[in-house]
Amino acid sequence: MADQRETKQEYLPGMVPPRGGALRRRGIYLLPNLFTTAGLFAGFYAIVQAMNGRFGEAAVAIFVAGLLDGLDGRVARMTRTQSEFGAEYDSLADMVSFGAAPALVLYEWALKDLDRFGWIAAFVYCAGAALRLARFNVMMDVVDKRYFQGLPSPAAAALVAGFVWLAHDNKIPLDDWGLQWVA
């Protein structure tokens, strides 16, 4: 009976069985999480720039966050450092970069003068991004990964950022064509 205890290995949460050696602890891996942190910073930077009226820089920061978001998962897969922590951290960073940042950039740029309707519209975008990310997290193991269901939050953020960037850089006034209502 003592021999059975010695040969039996228990797998605890966060432990990964290797291909023939002892268990190794799967923890927080640095490299992919550095990309995620950089993406989170880009989203935060976009919010700060929007609050300072620098909408072109804010839009570029959202695009940079999208680029970094595409790299963090690939780096984790290439280095075989995927973890549940990394997936959750990525999702939280996505909420800032592709949920809160585009909503606040759009609000500061075009919706602020609409009073209550402006912040409600910005909040609806932010809540939609949160719901999309939560649904993605719950369905992660169920859905065919070759296809997207719905519009991914980085793509929605890119549409908003691209719209703001083009209109701001081309100095299109907000009162032309009812641009506030389009935003």
Residue ranges with predicted function:
Residues M1-G70:
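Topogenic membrane-insertion module of multi-pass membrane proteins
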Residues A42-Y45, D72, A100, G128-L131, ...:
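Membrane-embedded alpha-helical transmembrane segments of multi-pass integral membrane proteins
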Residues Y45-V60, V96, A100-I120, F163-W181:
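Helix-coil boundary and interhelical linker segments in multi-pass alpha-helical membrane proteins
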Residues A2-D3, M15-L40, V75-M95, A134-A155:
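Interhelical loop and helix-boundary elements at the membrane-water interface
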Residues Y29-T36, M78-L133, F163:
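Multi-pass membrane catalytic core of lipid/isoprenoid biosynthesis enzymes
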Residues M1-G21, K145-A183:
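C-terminal membrane-associated helical module and adjoining short loops/tails
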Residues R19-A22, R26-T36, G56, K112-A122, ...:
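Membrane-water interface of alpha-helical transmembrane segments
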Residues F35-A38, A58-I62, A121-V124, G128, ...:
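Hydrophobic alpha-helical transmembrane segments of polytopic
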